[in-house]
């Protein structure tokens, strides 16, 4: 008889990443994981390759070089930064450090699935606050959060909706939460947002000791394979995360590639410009097919389908897969009538629109 794990662990449904296979089709187009359409910086790739002769050496446990590069690029203090194996690890470390069994965790209705995993791993209770027009609603979050709320997770911008709330609204949220509640701002897609009312939360985290911002190298920097993220916050919070992270949680290749990536502002600029052009194209073209597309500031779009037999999201997903186009079903988020499509290359984006056009006209 197998040894039983801690109560609640077997209730966790493992995270399922975006698929990369279409049965019977060689080299399908993967638009299911919000990966960078331009790949990664050549400088980052070269920096990673240069570590090949040093694989017998342990990396710097504090990722000092990387933290200093992030600090210089972003105008931050290196001692207020901690790095992790993707921002996913940092979110899990926050749960490990701050959540007790029975604590309340609050997220927005369509929040990133990892928040639920973090809560369940720690035996905490997750409450989802209703959204308004697929956008986080500060009033609803405040209503859901009481004195017993330990963490509020806010993805801003949010995945899978692609929407955001303004810096003023984020500040209003923090001001309305209990002092004992930690506000975690997941800004994985921050670099794609160019709207003047948006801010990733860095200024708020700099001012307060109850806010932390998580970031990733997987999106704008295109380093998803290396699993690299970072967080910025008050020294007391960062110190706690250093105490619960692994001693060598970020590998040498990630440190070197991340350092080169954060310094390659030209690649970041090209990534943003590509995304701005093609996210607008997808919204306009797919909207022209009679499908609703949620306005997105990220490198993906959320497409809504009717419940008409033969034209549902599930039908569209099956058809697109048969054409070698893999996008993401989002029913685990409570969005059974929608699909999420990553912004790809020009060829991939046009191919997606053509396939959806054929599907809708059939």
Swiss-Prot record:
State the pathway, as annotated in the record.
Amino-acid biosynthesis; L-histidine biosynthesis; L-histidine from 5-phospho-alpha-D-ribose 1-diphosphate: step 7/9
Point out residues bearing the modification N6-(pyridoxal phosphate)lysine: 219
Q: Which domain of life is it from?
A: Bacteria
Q: Which UniProt keywords apply?
A: Amino-acid biosynthesis, Aminotransferase, Histidine biosynthesis, Pyridoxal phosphate, Transferase
Pfam families assigned: Aminotran_1_2
The Gene Ontology biological process annotation of the record reads: L-histidine biosynthetic process
* Record has Zinc-finger as a keyword: no
Q: Does the keyword Oxidoreductase apply?
A: no
EC number(s): the record gives: 2.6.1.9
Catalysis: reaction(s)? L-histidinol phosphate + 2-oxoglutarate = 3-(imidazol-4-yl)-2-oxopropyl phosphate + L-glutamate
Q: Which Cys-Cys disulfides exist here?
A: none
Cofactor(s) this protein requires: pyridoxal 5'-phosphate
Q: Which PANTHER family does the UniProt entry name for this protein?
A: HISTIDINOL-PHOSPHATE AMINOTRANSFERASE, HISTIDINOL-PHOSPHATE AMINOTRANSFERASE 2
Question: Whom does it interact with, and what assembly results?
Answer: Homodimer.
The family classification in the record reads: Belongs to the class-II pyridoxal-phosphate-dependent aminotransferase family. Histidinol-phosphate aminotransferase subfamily.
Q: What is this protein called?
A: Histidinol-phosphate aminotransferase
* Annotated organism of origin: Maricaulis maris (strain MCS10)
């Amino acid at each position: 008889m197998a040894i039983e794990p801690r109560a609640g662990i077997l209730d966790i449904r493992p995270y399922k990443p975006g698929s990369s296979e279409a049965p019977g089709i060689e080299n399908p187009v993967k638009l299911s994981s919000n990966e960078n359409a331009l790949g990664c910086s050549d400088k980052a790739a070269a920096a990673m390759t240069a570590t090949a002769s040093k694989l017998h050496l342990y990396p710097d446990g504090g990722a000092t070089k990387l933290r200093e590069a992030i600090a210089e690029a972003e105008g931050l203090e290196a001692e207020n930064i901690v790095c992790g194996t993707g921002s996913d690890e940092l979110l899990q470390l926050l749960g490990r450090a701050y959540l007790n069994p029975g604590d309340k965790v609050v997220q927005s209705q369509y929040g990133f699935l990892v928040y639920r995993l973090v809560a369940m791993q720690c035996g905490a209770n997750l409450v989802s606050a209703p959204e308004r027009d697929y956008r986080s609603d500060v009033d609803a979050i405040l209503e859901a959060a009481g004195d017993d709320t330990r963490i509020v997770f806010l993805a801003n911008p949010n995945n899978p909706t692609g929407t955001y709330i303004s810096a003023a609204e984020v500040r209003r949220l923090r001001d309305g939460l209990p002092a004992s509640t930690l506000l975690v701002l997941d800004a994985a897609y921050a670099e794609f947002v160019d709207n003047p009312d948006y801010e990733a939360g860095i200024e708020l985290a700099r001012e307060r000791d109850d806010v932390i911002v998580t970031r990733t190298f997987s999106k704008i920097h295109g380093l998803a394979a290396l699993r690299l993220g970072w967080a910025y916050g008050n020294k007391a919070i960062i110190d706690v995360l250093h105490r619960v992270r692994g001693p060598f949680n970020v590998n040498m290749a990630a440190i070197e590639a991340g350092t080169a990536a954060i310094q390659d502002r030209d690649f970041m600029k090209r990534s943003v410009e590509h995304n701005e052009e093609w996210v607008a194209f997808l919204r306009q073209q797919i909207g022209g097919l009679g499908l609703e597309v949620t306005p997105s500031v990220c490198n993906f779009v959320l497409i809504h389908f009717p419940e008409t037999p033969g034209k549902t999201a599930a039908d569209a997903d099956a058809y697109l897969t048969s054409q070698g186009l893999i996008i993401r079903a989002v029913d685990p988020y409570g969005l059974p009538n929608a699909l999420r499509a990553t912004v790809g290359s020009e060829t991939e984006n046009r191919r997606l629109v053509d396939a959806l056009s054929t599907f809708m006209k059939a």
